[in-house]
Structures are given as structure tokens and as C-alpha cells.
């Protein structure tokens, strides 16, 4: 047993923290280690390891450090490789079929579609999407994975489009051109905006027209294309030709293809209108004894002539051309149109019995076929417009936009198809037919127009999910049937047609051999 311990006899411990002799009283961090101390400690550790492993502490060489660096480099390469494999797998998956309905052989790119437990070869991606009911892209898998499934018959729609990428256009623009000469004779259909530089076909100038001849039934004969319409004309009717300013000319109508002829809306014939009660006295008073059917004239303050047709219930303003047609048909004995004062015209009732829009306002100038062999009908309907419009173009060459090229149709002329088409490569058009009238609603059948000039009907009567399965998300563009019929006819796109099984696919009767350079 020990006695009491004197506190002064206890062992004391001195702090390892240096005494702060800084006159400013700066506080030092406890346990602070410098970079040189760490470097020295590492050197001592390497020297101890060298002595244990190599029995040499002189450190003339340091093979252990080289080995550690090699191990670290190898580890970094391994990690980098693993990360690269992971990233590569995101872009090109390993090929597990999973629940995917559309598969593709990685080795041959052959397409397959799953129907139940069987895997069927399929003719094209469009057919596969129609069968699966979704616009999925094929999953690339190994051949060994393909061979694990029981095989079914060949399915699909022969001739269906391989890809369906929708054009981003929201304004509908369709053009049908007919060239009687030049580099591209025949009918050409152009989709999208036109080019307007140089000698490209442009809208007809005011008071210009194109004289054509059509052999198409049921109305063969001569026609005048003007102001976005076509009017039948009898070139032997001097009353009309003289009024139009065509008298005394050697008239030689150019031939017009059925495609362009049908694309231009028809107007009433250019003949003298029938006026009821012609020759009788009108039901209103005039200062001059003028019968019904006669033409009178009044002059403005600037001496501009204003022509009026005398009808039984009033006067109707008419154009100089219609006034000349009426006078050339029956002048009612007047060498010059009787003149009325402006005050008398203002007191006289007005009538609207004649269709004055069926006649040009002024005499026309015919476009020469030798200088301007290309004639076009340009149909357009902007997305924000309530009505469509059509204009007649004329020029020396096709109005193709810069960089746009034509594709010749194999079945040109078969079923009314054009000779060639011009569409932006890589994209097609989801369209819906519309009537020829400017205000017709877009409520017709739906089609897909490919960049190769083929139209495919989309059958929505059987299944309303067909449009979604094809990946067509935006609203269809309107197109008149007179233009759409110029594209080559392709098969209908429906799920029922896509599920048709084949042992073999027959050749297309409208096919043609293409000469390819070796």
C-alpha cells in the first residue's frame, strides 16, 4: 500500500506544439504537416519496402514504383474500356429481343415482326409497323437470337414505302406542268415551293393567255387558259376572237396533256351570252330608244369609257371584251354604242343578269409556244387561308427550286400518271384530298406521297390507328385529286393488307429495267 502522492512528484508531459513566440500572437494549426514531410515519409516507406523485398536500401533504382505505376495504368485502361463498352451499348444494344415486336438481323439487316409466338419475315418497315400497331424502329439482334423463334410465313405489303419521314411544310403547294418542248417534255408534278429566277415559268402577266387544244373526251376542242381557268373557245367564231384581240392572227393552239388540262378548273365557254327578251323595249325609261341586248356607253370625268349592257330590268356594267362580243353578235343597228350621261346612268336601276367573270376584262395577248413551251397550274393553300387559289404559269423551263431534281416515273402515262415528279429527297407528304372549289373542306381520303412519286392510300375505315402506327402525327396537307392522280398509284396501307402471307412475291407488271454502269 502506498502513501499519499505529492502532486509535485507526478510525471509531467510537455506539449509538442511549439511555443508561440510570434509577437502578433498568430494562432498555429494543431498537427500541421508540410508537403516536404509527406514526401519524405513516402520516400522512407518506399525505402523500407525496397529493403524488405529486395534487400537493398540504397534506392539506386526503384522497380517497385515502376510496378505500381504499371498496375495503376492497367487499372485506368480497364476502367476506360468498361466505360467505353457501356457507352457503346447505349448506341448499339447487345441485341436482346425482349418484348420488341420489330426485329432486324444485325448481320443481314433482314426485317422480322413478331405475331404471337412466331417470328415472320416482313417485306418492309411500313408493313412491320402496321402489324405491330406502333411506329417503332427495329431492334438490332444477333442471328442466333433470331433463330430462337419459331419461323412464320413472309408477311407485308409488296411495294409499300421503306421509310415515311413527313415533310415539315405547313402550306400546301402543288404544281402540274406540261412542256411541249425543251429538256423535260411531258407532264411534271412539283411538290413544294417553286423557283422564280431566270427563264423559269412564272405567273401569266395581266391580259395574257395560252391557247391550247385538247383531244380528251368528253370535251375535245380548243381552250383558252387565262386567270387560273380554262374556257372553251370556237376559233371560227369571229364575234369572240375579234373581241379578244385574236382576229387576223394565224392561231395555232399548242397541244395540252390531260394532266394539266384536268388540273385547271373549267369556266363557261367564251361565247355571246343569251339575253332574255333581246330586241324588246326595257322595263325602265331611257333617254334614247335602246332595246334589250344593246350596249350603251358613258364617260367618266377623265374620259374613260364605261360600257353597260341593256337588260330588261336595268343596266349591267360589262368589260370592253364582253361589250365587243355583244356588239359583234348583234349591234342592234348602232354603228357606235349609244352614249348616256353619267347622271342618267346613276338614275337607272342596275342589273346582275350576266356572268361577267366568264370573260376577260381586256383583249388578250397569246403566249408563243416557241419562246415559252412550259405551261403550269400552280395550286396553293396556306395553312392560315380559308380558300385555295390557282394560277397559270408560263415560261421556258420548269419552275424547279434550286437544288431540286426530277424523278422519272416508270409507269408514265399508265392510269394518268405524269412523266416525272420533283419532291424533296428523303421526305414525303401526308395528304388529304380536297374539292376543286376554292372553299372546299379537307375531308377526303388520306394518302402518303413518297419522294419517288408514288401515292399510297391510307385505309382508315378498318382501323383508325393506322395513321398513328405509321408515325404520322401532324395534320395532312390538302391536295386536289386532279393533282394527286398524276402520281403513280401504289398499294393501300392497312393492317389487314400487311398481315397477308406470301410464299413468294410476284413482279410488278409496270416495272422496267434500269441501265446501271459497271
Curated annotation (Swiss-Prot):
Q: How does it sit in the membrane?
A: Single-pass membrane protein
| One cellular component (GO) term of this entry | plasma membrane
- Keywords noted in UniProt: ATP-binding, Cell inner membrane, Cell membrane, Hydrolase, Membrane, Nucleotide-binding, Transmembrane, Transmembrane helix, Transport
The principal localisation class reads: membrane
Instruction: State which residue ranges cross the membrane.
Output: 71-91
Q: Where in the cell is it found?
A: Cell inner membrane
Q: Which Pfam families match?
A: T7SS_ESX1_EccB (PF05108)
Q: Which domain of life is it from?
A: Bacteria
Tell me the GO molecular function terms.
ATP binding; hydrolase activity
What broad class of enzyme is this? hydrolase
Stretches the record annotates as Disordered: 1-26
Q: What is its EC number?
A: 3.6.-.-
UniProt-listed InterPro entries: T7SS_EccB, T7SS_EccB_R1, T7SS_EccB_R3
What family does the entry list?
Belongs to the EccB family.
Describe the subunit structure. Answer: Part of the ESX-3 / type VII secretion system (T7SS), which is composed of cytosolic and membrane components. The ESX-3 membrane complex is composed of EccB3, EccC3, EccD3 and EccE3.
Report the function annotation for this chain.
An ATPase. Part of the ESX-3 specialized secretion system, which is required for siderophore-mediated iron acquisition and for the secretion of EsxH and EsxG.
> What protein does this entry describe?
ESX-3 secretion system ATPase EccB3
Organism expressing this protein natively: Mycolicibacterium smegmatis (strain ATCC 700084 / mc(2)155) (Mycobacterium smegmatis)
Lineage of producing organism:
Bacteria, Bacillati, Actinomycetota, Actinomycetes, Mycobacteriales
Q: Which gene encodes it?
A: eccB3
Amino acid at each position: 500500500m502506498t502513501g499519499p502522492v505529492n502532486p509535485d512528484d507526478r510525471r509531467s508531459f510537455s506539449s509538442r506544439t511549439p511555443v508561440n513566440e510570434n509577437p502578433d500572437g498568430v494562432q498555429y494549426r494543431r498537427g500541421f504537416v508540410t508537403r516536404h514531410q509527406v514526401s519524405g515519409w513516402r520516400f522512407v516507406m518506399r525505402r523500407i519496402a525496397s529493403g524488405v523485398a529486395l534487400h537493398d536500401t540504397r534506392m539506386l533504382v526503384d522497380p517497385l514504383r515502376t510496378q505500381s505505376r504499371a498496375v495503376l495504368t492497367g487499372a485506368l485502361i480497364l476502367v476506360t474500356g468498361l466505360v467505353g463498352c457501356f457507352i457503346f451499348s447505349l448506341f448499339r444494344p447487345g441485341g436482346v429481343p425482349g418484348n420488341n415486336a420489330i426485329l432486324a438481323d444485325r448481320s443481314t439487316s433482314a426485317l422480322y415482326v413478331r405475331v404471337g409466338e412466331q417470328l415472320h419475315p416482313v417485306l418492309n418497315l411500313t408493313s412491320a409497323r402496321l402489324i405491330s400497331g406502333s411506329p417503332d424502329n427495329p431492334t438490332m439482334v444477333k442471328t442466333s437470337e433470331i433463330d430462337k423463334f419459331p419461323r412464320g410465313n413472309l408477311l407485308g405489303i409488296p411495294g409499300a414505302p421503306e421509310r415515311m419521314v413527313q415533310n415539315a411544310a405547313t402550306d400546301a403547294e402543288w404544281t402540274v406542268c406540261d412542256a411541249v418542248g425543251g429538256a423535260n417534255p411531258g407532264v411534271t408534278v412539283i411538290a413544294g415551293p417553286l423557283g422564280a429566277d431566270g427563264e423559269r415559268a412564272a405567273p401569266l402577266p395581266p391580259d395574257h393567255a395560252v391557247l391550247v387544244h385538247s383531244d380528251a373526251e368528253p370535251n375535245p376542242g380548243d381552250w383558252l387558259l387565262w386567270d387560273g381557268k380554262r374556257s372553251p373557245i370556237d376559233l371560227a367564231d369571229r364575234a369572240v376572237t375579234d373581241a379578244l384581240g385574236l382576229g387576223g392572227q394565224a392561231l395555232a393552239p399548242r397541244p395540252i396533256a390531260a394532266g394539266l388540262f384536268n388540273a385547271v378548273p373549267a369556266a363557261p365557254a367564251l361565247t355571246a351570252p343569251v339575253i332574255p327578251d333581246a330586241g324588246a323595249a326595257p322595263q325602265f325609261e331611257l333617254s334614247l330608244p335602246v332595246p334589250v341586248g344593246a350596249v350603251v356607253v358613258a364617260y367618266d370625268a377623265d374620259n374613260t369609257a364605261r360600257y353597260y349592257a341593256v337588260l330588261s330590268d336595268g343596266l349591267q356594267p360589262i368589260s370592253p371584251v364582253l361589250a365587243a362580243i355583244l356588239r359583234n353578235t348583234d349591234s342592234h343597228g348602232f354603228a357606235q354604242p349609244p352614249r348616256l350621261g353619267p347622271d342618267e346612268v346613276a338614275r337607272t336601276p342596275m342589273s346582275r343578269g350576266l356572268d361577267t367573270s366568264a370573260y376577260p376584262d381586256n383583249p388578250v395577248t397569246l403566249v408563243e409556244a416557241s419562246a415559252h413551251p412550259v405551261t403550269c397550274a400552280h395550286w396553293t393553300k396556306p395553312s392560315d387561308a380559308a380558300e385555295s387559289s390557282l394560277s397559270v404559269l408560263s415560261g421556258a423551263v420548269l419552275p424547279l427550286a434550286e437544288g431540286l431534281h426530277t424523278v422519272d416515273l416508270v409507269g408514265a402515262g399508265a392510269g394518268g400518271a405524269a412523266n416525272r415528279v420533283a419532291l424533296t429527297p428523303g421526305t414525303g407528304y401526308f395528304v388529304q384530298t380536297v374539292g376543286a372549289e376554292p372553299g372546299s373542306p379537307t375531308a377526303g381520303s388520306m394518302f402518303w406521297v413518297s419522294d419517288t412519286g408514288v401515292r399510297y392510300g391510307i385505309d382508315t375505315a378498318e382501323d383508325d390507328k393506322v395513321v398513328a402506327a405509321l408515325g404520322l402525327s401532324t395534320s395532312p396537307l390538302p391536295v386536289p385529286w386532279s393533282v394527286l392522280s398524276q402520281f403513280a398509284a401504289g398499294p393501300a396501307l392497312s393492317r389487314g393488307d400487311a398481315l397477308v402471307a406470301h410464299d413468294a412475291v410476284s413482279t410488278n407488271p409496270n416495272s422496267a429495267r434500269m441501265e446501271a454502269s459497271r
